[in-house]
């Protein structure tokens, strides 16, 4: 049977750039904007489940459930969450500098240290209820990956020493 849908891409450039493109295409490198998006989704879910709370009286109009848990104690984790929420409301541009800053907030929030199995049952239920209908938007459209696998993979995905930089 012929393959009617055979797509090809050809790249020209320096060997180092082509090698970086191949690493990116194979999934060996996570682009910074993708990391920021995934970590942002994880922070969104953690906030919606009440695992993180704002340190100020803030309301997020597009999704009031994100701040429904109310004001939390002043802690490094909640301060980082509040700062992340401010950037979300401001629609921060996902350039390299901002992506690294958002990653730092994710680290400070402690979300990456919270394995799925260690989350309270009610938080896991809340996160699953939010994640499941959005899986196609937030992950791969063809993905049937369980939320627990997705969550723990984010926790395990350490930022490489040299982020992917494609300069043309």
UniProtKB/Swiss-Prot annotation:
InterPro entries: Api92-like_dom_sf (IPR023136), DUF1281 (IPR009694). It holds the Pfam family DUF1281. SUPFAM superfamilies: Api92-like (SSF160940). It comes from the Bacteria. Keywords: Plasmid. This is Uncharacterized protein YubA. It comes from Escherichia coli (strain K12).
């Amino acid at each position: 049977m012929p393959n009617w849908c055979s797509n090809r891409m050809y790249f020209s450039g320096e060997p180092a750039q082509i090698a970086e493109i191949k690493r990116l295409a194979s999934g060996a490198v996570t682009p910074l904007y993708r990391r920021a998006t995934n970590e942002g989704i994880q922070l969104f879910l953690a906030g919606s489940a009440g695992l993180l709370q704002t340190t100020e009286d803030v309301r997020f109009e597009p999704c009031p459930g994100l701040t429904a848990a109310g004001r939390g104690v002043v802690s490094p984790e909640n301060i980082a969450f509040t700062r992340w929420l401010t950037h979300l409301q401001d629609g921060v541009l996902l350039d390299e500098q901002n992506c690294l800053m958002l990653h730092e907030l994710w680290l400070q929030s402690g979300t990456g240290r919270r394995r799925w199995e260690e989350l309270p049952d009610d938080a896991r239920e809340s996160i699953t209820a939010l994640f499941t209908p959005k899986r196609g938007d937030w992950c791969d459209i063809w993905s049937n990956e369980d939320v627990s696998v997705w969550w723990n993979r984010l926790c395990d995905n350490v930022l490489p020493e040299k982020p992917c930089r494609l300069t043309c």
